[in-house]
Amino acid sequence: MPRKAREYPEEGEFVVATVKNIHPYGAFLILDEYPGKEGFMHISEVAPTWVKNIRDYVKEGQKVVVKVIRVDPEKGHIDLSLKRVNQQQRKAKLQEYKRAQKAENLLKMAAEKIGKDFETAWREVWVPLEEEYGEVYAAFEDAAQNGIEVLKGLIPDEWLDALKPIIEAYVEIPTVTIDAEFEITVPKPNGIEIIKEALIRARDRANEEKDIDVKFTYQGAPRYRIDITAPDYYKAEEVLESIAEEILRVIKEAGGEATLIRKEKRIRKIKRR
């Protein structure tokens, strides 16, 4: 089970917890990411409406996402709230938790590979990477995209060698795909050839960049669709802007007209091989 490097959660943090026992006035929950730590959720923090029976909302053994509203390390008190977590926050926290589970499994594979127990792995790898990146899986994504060398100096070199093939095989990198359309006309006998040449040159130049993929699709005159896949939205936008400037320049010089029509971005994942 993934655990945080910190001993206590911070106020305002969303955590995954397991309902331990329920009382008429509230419930005690085990904080899954903080070993040995429990929190209390008063009945007034269960739902935004009046709660007659707390068991209508939570069950013993149930896993829930709750918000930490107060922490007193000296007394060991942690107050929790379920009603202050909306659906979007719950979804985001569960996604983060799943990423932590995957990172933990990959680290266990690396530990087994070099004959170390997970406590050592947690101390030598998990803690420094979480402190640097906020979450360990984000560190693994960075290594998958930019090379294991980005982790050098953060963790011992023996872990770099053990993690490299594991990250390459199992870590998925989020990529952003944006699409748009160009309306292009060149009123000349060889207008189609001029348009094709402009699109091909723009595409090939963009595809020379690392982790960039550009595709054009003919949609029927005068429309041409462009799909750009990049590591992040800002890079995709940068590439689109560069391509648009190139196409508009070439078409204008040829005596034609070109217009860019924007569409929405899409997010998908690719697996490093």
UniProtKB/Swiss-Prot annotation:
Pfam families: EIF_2_alpha (PF07541), S1 (PF00575). GO terms for molecular function: ribosome binding; RNA binding; translation initiation factor activity. It comes from the Archaea. InterPro entries: NA-bd_OB-fold, S1_domain, S1_IF2_alpha, TIF2_asu_arc, TIF2_asu_C, TIF2_asu_middle_sf, TIF_2_asu. Disulfide bonds: none annotated. eIF-2 functions in the early steps of protein synthesis by forming a ternary complex with GTP and initiator tRNA. This is Translation initiation factor 2 subunit alpha. It comes from Thermococcus gammatolerans (strain DSM 15229 / JCM 11827 / EJ3). The gene is eif2a.
